Amino acid sequence: MTDMIEQSDDRIDPIDGVLADGVLADDVLAKEREQAPAPGELTPFAAPLTVPPVLRPASDEVTRETEIALRPTWVRLHPQLPPTLMWGYDGQVPGPTIEVRRGQRVRIAWTNRIPKGSEYPVTSVEVPLGPPGTPAPNTEPGRGGVEPNKDVAALPAWSVTHLHGAQTGGGNDGWADNAVGFGDAQLSEYPNDHQATQWWYHDHAMNITRWNVMAGLYGTYLVRDDEEDALGLPSGDREIPLLIADRNLDTDEDGRLNGRLLHKTVIVQQSNPETGKPVSIPFFGPYTTVNGRIWPYADVDDGWYRLRLVNASNARIYNLVLIDEDDRPVPGVVHQIGSDGGLLPRPVPVDFDDTLPVLSAAPAERFDLLVDFRALGGRRLRLVDKGPGAPAGTPDPLGGVRYPEVMEFRVRETCEEDSFALPEVLSGSFRRMSHDIPHGHRLIVLTPPGTKGSGGHPEIWEMAEVEDPADVQVPAEGVIQVTGADGRTKTYRRTAATFNDGLGFTIGEGTHEQWTFLNLSPILHPMHIHLADFQVLGRDAYDASGFDLALGGTRTPVRLDPDTPVPLAPNELGHKDVFQVPGPQGLRVMGKFDGAYGRFMYHCHLLEHEDMGMMRPFVVMPPEALKFDHGGAHGGHGEGHTG
């Protein structure tokens, strides 16, 4: 890094035996692996939580960039494990926590310092589906005798960094094709003109994001402002970033964990008839890492803490519960004060009751949490991932949760008074969006795997309304009819389905749009839209039985079910850029595309889905220039529509 940086001293201890360019001596690694445990022998809560160092770019001389270098590194994920080869920002996993003030414009040179010919840190395999009634084999460590994917092993260090949540121009956003190799830098400028929030940065390279992020290329980014300062929230050692991610590890011939990162997925179709290729489901691993360590513990005082949580997993949706020594949920101590785009208007209690039984965290979602440990001195509390078929804290292998542990909090008795009081109002500047704001409309359909022409994968379909249904054949491939709450049936035709299809959405800067994601499959997709903050307007249940996979369209209309209301959760009413879209359901979100121009992306944030095609571009330009656009797909109904 350059001398333009203020950085904390909280660095992670180095691994003995690391040579130049991040290479670990062979004899050191061999000796470590000889002493490695079997998969079931890892002890939970055996190592303290590591906290990434804080990097504060200098506030003056914006024309001089801050360099953050991508480097190979060796990380001990658990005290009982051999070192693990990873790639990290500034050689750390996660990368440094970048902290800026609102309006502090910074330029970052994301420089690739991973030497050519470096070993790729991730082993990738696809394994057969197990017998019915048995746990999915992807949550079991080891390759199970399956040969690694040689094409993944041959991947170069090719990366582009996306600052997730940032309002910045398209040239700075981390366009997936614009990845750089060794010695080159991605130069990005971030205005940071945004309310206080937690963003995060991660690799976004086309086709290979799922492996690059697993290799360690992620970190968090905090924007501060005066409104946040006035709240007097816990800070310093009492503000802790928690980047959680599930991982899997390979084993040696004796069944011992060798520390090697393993991307292990399950084949659900051996040979798709359209492509001849196998179809696998996204990655879910058995081990949870927090800040790059498996099942750590944190020593905390009996006071208030602020936890800045990010789900940095490829695909796992965590259902988090805070439990005590007897596996009972702990109510009354956790309060959510912010989400993806900043502070909520008021705190939301997370009591693990009927209102919020779990803290459901999909990949890329962020949660700003206040935790009150004042009455818990001398106690040990555990944050766990609750499986669908077991109580909190209990393994649920059939539900995909082989090990529920996430981390442990060990509360010290200090007998010191903590004068912090939970504010009644968090953000006086927050304004709730409503449907009567002039806006345009978009309809995006998320199709089930196995739909005609999809190669066995779910897809994003951009839809355009057909004003006269006589203009299209019904039923037909790519044609969907939808019956709304008013009983009217509208006909839509597909205009795009893959990333490289023609540009479909061109948006005038400064305009509002309502995007409706209609999920016709049972798979939950966390959808992410770059550039803009959105608010969830509503959810609607649908009867999707009229959609025919073999046809690739509807034989009878997909129908909104007015008799099945879907209430919004109290903690999803703030600014968000990732939205959980289960199916069959329609999700309506409203956002304003302002502050930047350029070409951006929206996509499913299950990284395997993103890499396999669930990603589409959109363009934002000045509305004055949009009048001369020849693309013809700019705004649905256009700014000014309120219906």
Swiss-Prot record:
InterPro entries hit by this protein: AmiPhnlOxPhsA, Cu-oxidase-like_N, Cu-oxidase_C, Cu-oxidase_fam, Cu_oxidase_CS, Cu_oxidase_Cu_BS, Cupredoxin
CDD domains: CuRO_1_BOD_CotA_like, CuRO_2_PHS, CuRO_3_PHS
Residues holding Cu cation 1: 162, 528
One Gene Ontology MF term: copper ion binding
Entry's cofactor comment: Binds 5 copper ions per monomer.
Positions annotated to bind Cu cation 4: 435, 439, 441
Function: Could be involved in the spore pigmentation and melanin production. Catalyzes the oxidative coupling of 2-aminophenols to form the 2-aminophenoxazinone chromophore. 2-aminophenoxazinone synthesis proceeds via a sequence of three consecutive 2-electron aminophenol oxidations. First, the o-aminophenol is oxidized by two electrons to the quinone imine, which then conjugates to a second o-aminophenol molecule while still bound to the enzyme. This product is further oxidized by two electrons to give rise to the p-quinone imine.
Protein origin, superkingdom: Bacteria
Name under which the protein is recorded: O-aminophenol oxidase
Residues where Cu cation 2 binds: 164, 202, 605
Organism, as annotated: Streptomyces antibioticus
Gene responsible for this protein: phsA
Residue sites binding Cu cation 3 per the record: 204, 530, 603
Pfam family, one: Cu-oxidase_2
Residues annotated as binding Cu cation 5: 525, 604, 609, 614
Cofactor or coenzyme needed: Cu(2+)
Record's keyword terms, sorted: Antibiotic biosynthesis, Copper, Metal-binding, Oxidoreductase, Repeat
pH effects: Optimum pH is 5.
Listed EC numbers: 1.10.3.4
The protein's assembly and partners: Homodimer (small form) or homohexamer (large form).
Catalysed reactions, semicolon-separated: 4 2-aminophenol + 3 O2 = 2 2-aminophenoxazin-3-one + 6 H2O
Lineage: Bacteria, Bacillati, Actinomycetota, Actinomycetes, Kitasatosporales
Region (Disordered): 129-149
Plastocyanin-like domain location: 87-224, 494-621
Family indicated by similarity: Belongs to the multicopper oxidase family.
